[in-house]
Amino acid sequence: MKGLLQRVRSARVEVGTEVVGAIDQGILVLVGIEPQDTRASADKLLHKLLNYRVFSDADGKMNLSLREVSGGLLLVSQFTLAADTKSGLRAGFSKAAAPALGAELFDYLLSQARIAHPVVAAGQFGADMQVHLINDGPVTFLFET
């Protein structure tokens, strides 16, 4: 499972003209699910997302986690993170999970996030989404579990 974390001042995701998820300060995470991923992969990723120190303390050092700043978590599924781009000029998606597994694991990740953290929003799995964000830093990390 891959999670591309971006620290944001705010972010929102729309499907058509409807806003389906939005946060103020926090992290936007694009989630890519692969065939070998399990609930354990999702649990490991969630632990990293909630506890990784990406926010600045009073001295300007990245010493604070999402939990410590009470920031928002916006999860957006993105199967293209599992793309194979090693050869040719067109991505291959054989390394992406099948839609049924992807939906199951994304829903699990989202449900566990809502249990563990007070401010959680999400995009719509499988939808054509427009993601708007104000990147803060920019600070971006790629996690692979």
UniProtKB/Swiss-Prot annotation:
Highest taxon, organism lineage: Bacteria
Assigned EC number: 3.1.1.96
Chain span(s) of sequence motif Gly-cisPro motif, important for rejection of L-amino acids: 137-138
GO molecular function, one term: D-tyrosyl-tRNA(Tyr) deacylase activity
A Pfam family reported for this protein in Swiss-Prot or TrEMBL: Tyr_Deacylase
Compartments (UniProt record): Cytoplasm
GO CC, one annotated term: cytoplasm
UniProt xrefs under NCBIfam families: D-aminoacyl-tRNA deacylase (TIGR00256)
Name of the protein: D-aminoacyl-tRNA deacylase
